[in-house]
Curated annotation (Swiss-Prot):
The gene is aceA. This is Isocitrate lyase. SUPFAM superfamilies: Phosphoenolpyruvate/pyruvate domain. Its EC number is 4.1.3.1. It comes from Halalkalibacterium halodurans (strain ATCC BAA-125 / DSM 18197 / FERM 7344 / JCM 9153 / C-125). The active site is at 188 (proton acceptor). The lineage of its organism: Bacteria, Bacillati, Bacillota, Bacilli, Bacillales. The keyword Transferase does not apply.
Length: 427
């Protein structure tokens, strides 16, 4: 038996016997995967360990909740505060973190490698925080939190999905989600004008993403999102799975009208379940009743299937729910099987509101307002906050150690020694 065949057989045995792949269907063979790998095995440590960690969390925790991070610094603060995973939203990347350098709405207008770039940026920030902690010998924070990243509608067809998934893994993403919208007309799930692709086309995209992860040798968590609860357009009537929802009406662009709603979303969730690790139904309001309806329908056919839920800032929470329900909303979702829950645009709103409040106070009271921010930072240190000492936070001490190691401890140009931070911001 050749090494090629042996590797392929081991791969297929893992798919058959490993609990990780229970219920996951692949319409391709282990041999086909090995053919696409090339001769040199490359390890993707961050992506692999993160995916394994996230899978473990999803099965051991009541639920894993995350906030959308826009920057590496935001991700560090989330982990310091105790969150166990990071969410990376394409909406936020479009708004203020894409490689085009422009502000965009959530319509896939930015370069396709922008989200992988931010994944890499966040992982490098978390790595620096870990290096600082390791050097100082204090603290036990596990900074390498798994990142679940937004691949939107794949930025094209199945080959684009394949390449985008590879880029996500290379950057260190632990989980990636793909939605069933037409990439060229993609919209935020809470905007109008969304156009679905046929169910079988969406499944091919999921197969493509899984194939990419298998070729890379990484058990990436694959999340299938459907926008069918709100989307009332579809590109084609060719797929029998979609035909019962199509009204017969056409649009000027040639799209077909559909009966949007939870039944259409359930049908798609059921179709995607064998090809994804989690199913996410994008909703238009925070409704435990609708969440239960979707979960029950999925679990009737796929017991124990993991679900994801967007606790979106596009919802006016207090206009929809009372305070008591809001406080327990995530716990109730967790009981239904929504094991990954996230606030997509938390970073955007935290960044904008905190800066507006500071600027508003600063305009009125000058340094009094900034001093209050600084005092609030000092007060948060008992909770584990450390960015009050901003020089240390970004690694000045770490690079002082690099300099001392190079010079045998004789460097006279280290940065923290003699700094105002050393003099005025001691613990």
């Amino acid at each position: 038996m050749s090494g090629w065949q042996e590797t392929a057989e081991k791969l297929e045995m893992s798919w058959s016997n490993d609990v990780r792949w229970q219920g996951v269907e692949r319409p391709y063979s282990g041999e086909e995967v090995v053919k696409l790998r090339g001769s040199l095995k490359i390890e993707y440590t961050l992506a692999k360990t993160g995916a394994e960690k996230l899978w473990k969390l999803l099965h051991e925790e009541d639920y894993v909740n995350a906030l959308g991070a826009m920057t590496g610094g935001q991700a560090i603060q989330q982990v310091k505060a105790g969150l166990k995973a990071i969410y990376l939203s394409g909406w936020q990347v479009a708004a203020d973190a894409n490689l085009a350098g422009h502000m965009y709405p959530d319509q896939s207008l930015y370069p396709a490698n922008s989200v992988p770039s931010v994944v890499k940026r966040i992982n490098q920030a978390l790595q620096r925080a870990d290096q600082i902690q390791h050097l100082e010998g204090e603290g036990e924070v596990d900074y390498f939190a798994p990142i679940v990243a937004d691949a939107e509608a794949g930025f094209g067809g199945q080959l684009n999905v394949f390449e985008l998934m590879k880029a996500m893994i290379e950057a260190g993403a632990s989980g990636v989600h793909f939605e069933d919208q037409l990439a060229s007309e993609k919209k935020c799930g809470h905007l109008g004008g969304k156009v679905l692709i046929p169910t079988q086309t969406a499944i091919r995209n999921l197969v493509s993403a899984r194939l990419a992860a298998d070729v890379m040798g990484v058990p990436t968590i694959l999340v299938a999102r459907t926008d069918a609860d709100a989307a009332d357009l579809i590109t084609s009537d060719i797929d029998p799975a979609d035909q019962r929802f199509i009204t017969g009406e056409r649009t000027p662009e040639g799209f077909y009208r559909t009966n949007a709603g939870i039944e259409q979303a359930i049908a798609r969730g059921l179709a995607y379940a064998p090809y994804a690790d989690l199913i996410w139904c994008e909703t238009s309001k925070p409704s435990l009743e609708e969440a239960k309806q979707f979960a029950d329908a999925i679990h009737e056919k796929f017991p124990g299937k993991l679900l994801a839920y967007n606790c979106s800032p596009s919802f006016n929470w207090e206009a929809n729910l009372d305070r008591a329900t809001i406080e327990t909303f995530q716990q109730e979702l967790g009981k239904m099987g929504y094991k990954f829950q996230f606030v997509t645009l938390a970073g955007f709103h935290a960044l904008n509101h905190s800066m507006f409040e500071l600027a508003y106070g600063y305009k009125q009271r000058g340094m009094g307002a900034y001093s209050e921010l600084q005092q609030a930072e000092f007060a948060s240190e008992v909770k584990g906050y450390t960015a009050t000492r901003h020089q240390r936070e970004v690694g000045t001490g770490y690079f002082d150690q690099v300099a001392q190691t190079i010079t045998g401890g004789t460097s006279s140009t280290t940065a923290l020694t003699g700094s105002t931070e050393e003099a005025q911001f001691q613990k």
